[in-house]
Amino acid sequence: MPTFTREEIVHLGDLARIALTDEEITRMQSELNVIADAIDSVQEVATADVEPTANPVPLEAYLRPDVPATPLTQAEALSGAPVAEDGMFVAPRILGEE
């Protein structure tokens, strides 16, 4: 049963550059110990007769049939746009002049 010490919690906070109060350290210590106990209980599961697998869920692609459809006209595509200009969507600039 792994247990996290107060010193380890403080060290983790320092690594993350997070200042922890005494109350937060106590709470984090308790929560991390519960998580570590849960991980330990999962590791105790008997897996000797379980075949190793990369993914427990079968990987199958469920695709719809590729049926041609009538595309939207430019006017229909732009009809829901808040701002359109010269047949194009207008969006606010997100990158400044750098």
Curated annotation (Swiss-Prot):
Entry EC number(s)? 6.3.5.-
**SUPFAM superfamilies tied to this protein:** Glu-tRNAGln amidotransferase C subunit
**Residues spanning the membrane:** none
Q: Does the keyword Metal-binding apply?
A: no
Query: Which UniProt key words apply to this protein?
Result: ATP-binding, Ligase, Nucleotide-binding, Protein biosynthesis
Which Gene3D superfamilies is this protein grouped with? Glu-tRNAGln amidotransferase C subunit, N-terminal domain
Q: Which reaction does it catalyse?
A: L-glutamyl-tRNA(Gln) + L-glutamine + ATP + H2O = L-glutaminyl-tRNA(Gln) + L-glutamate + ADP + phosphate + H(+); L-aspartyl-tRNA(Asn) + L-glutamine + ATP + H2O = L-asparaginyl-tRNA(Asn) + L-glutamate + ADP + phosphate + 2 H(+)
Give the matching PANTHER family: GLUTAMYL-TRNA(GLN) AMIDOTRANSFERASE SUBUNIT C, MITOCHONDRIAL
Q: How does it assemble?
A: Heterotrimer of A, B and C subunits.
The molecule here is called: Aspartyl/glutamyl-tRNA(Asn/Gln) amidotransferase subunit C
